[in-house]
Regions:
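C-terminal intrinsically disordered, low-complexity extensions immediately downstream
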Residues: 319-359
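Catalytic-loop of the protein kinase fold
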Residues: 142-158
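Glycine-rich ATP phosphate-binding loop
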Residues: 38-44, 48-58
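Conserved catalytic-loop aspartate of Hanks-type protein kinases
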Residues: 204
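Conserved short submotifs of the Hanks-type protein kinase catalytic core
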Residues: 95-108
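C-terminal lobe substrate-recognition/regulatory segment of protein kinase catalytic domains
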Residues: 246-289
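Activation segment signature within eukaryotic-like protein kinase domains
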Residues: 130-131
Length: 359
């Protein structure tokens, strides 16, 4: 998402900041590359301690099924800790938009990492607390066979009390479902090697490991090759760069890559950190957890449950864990969202979901 200026703000928000019953003052907004999704942030005029976030989705750019799935997962999780709470959804067919409305007062982890003047992340106990909450959120998702598919710093929100909420379920799916969207720098080797595969919970686990490194180093996109020409950026280049961080040669053959990903031997590759990176992390238990999250063979990557029991996180998770957290009641029959959806059915299902928000 990139920030946009006041002049670039599209209607219907440019001239009228009142949407339905929400009265707010627009402060900022950002958009994705093709303008299909725009996120607005503003101050709630009726309660200035709260911000209002409006995610505008253009229906012409995103399939009915994808829009409804995002709303479905947001409603499914709205009463759970560690997840963004959806306040309302609005449909404007004449403007061709859906509005998802959230109320809170948060900043993204991405913003905290990018803030050069902010010493917030210099507190290593606070970093551990953030990592614990993200991990517990993934534990809840995976216990319910939900894969987020786009865990990254912009999708992790933190409030003034350092409470974490995971947001943006536009790529979420149930296990064994395909999901087309991904962010290359947080995608695991097996997916970069073959994007046709169906991602599972181990994809989220890889992203968690990347985020851990970035929190300790206060650096975004740890797996981004800063020396690479933009024209050369593709999944193969990205995969080779990731493998180089494990000390594995570049220009490796596809056959050798497949052997690494499906390696069943006891041989394990770990990230080779620079001396200054080790000094910044300065926690052997954290390094051990990172090495167990960032395993090239997905079958050998630990689960969120096991990560919570690790030496690094166990002080927060002791007494909190259950091997089963399947406690979520589904707002509608999910099978309604698995087939192609007509415009008429879209409106019917949308209204069904909207009725469930205030339950």
């Amino acid at each position: 998402m990139t920030n946009i200026t006041e002049k670039e703000i599209p209607s219907p928000l440019k001239d009228n900041y009142k949407i339905d019953n929400y009265n707010w003052k627009l402060e900022s907004c950002s958009k994705d590359d093709n303008n299909s999704r725009i996120v607005y942030c503003g101050i709630n005029k009726e309660d200035k301690n709260d911000c209002i976030y409006v995610k505008q989705i253009k229906i012409s750019f995103v399939s009915y099924k994808k829009i409804l799935k995002e709303i479905y997962f947001l409603i499914l999780l709205k009463k759970m800790d560690f997840f963004v709470h959806l306040d309302d959804i609005l449909l404007s067919l004449d403007k061709g938009c859906i509005f998802l409305i959230f109320i809170g007062n948060t900043v993204s982890l991405n913003s905290l990492i990018n803030s050069k003047k902010n010493n917030y992340l210099s507190n290593k106990e606070l970093v551990k607390w953030i990592i614990y909450q993200i991990t517990f959120g993934l534990y809840i998702l995976h216990s319910n066979n939900i894969i987020h598919n786009d865990i990254k710093p912009p999708n992790i929100l933190i409030d003034g009390d350092s409470n974490v909420t995971i947001c943006d379920f536009g790529s979420a799916s149930y296990k064994q479902e395909s999901s087309e969207d991904y962010t290359r720098y947080y995608s695991p080797p097996e997916f970069l090697n073959d994007t046709r595969i169906i991602r599972d919970e181990k994809s989220d686990i890889w992203a968690l490991g990347v985020i851990m490194i970035e929190l300790f180093l206060v650096q975004n996109n740890f797996f981004k090759n800063r020396n690479e020409n933009n024209k050369n950026k593709n999944n193969k280049n990205q995969l080779e760069y990731i493998l180089s961080k494990f000390g594995i040669k570049q220009n490796i053959s596809n056959e050798e890559i497949n052997k690494l990903i499906n390696n069943d031997s006891n041989l394990k590759y770990n990230i080779i950190f620079e001396k200054e990176e080790i000094e910044k992390i300065n926690d052997k238990d954290a390094v051990e957890l990172i090495n167990n999250l960032l395993v090239i063979n997905p079958k050998k990557r630990i689960s969120a449950f096991d990560a919570l029991k690790s030496n690094y996180l166990k002080e927060y998770s002791e007494g909190e864990l259950s091997s089963d957290l399947n406690i979520i009641e589904k707002p509608i029959n999910y099978e309604e969202l698995t087939d192609e959806i007509s415009k008429e059915n879209f409106e019917i299902i949308f209204n069904k979901l909207k009725a469930k928000i205030k339950d």
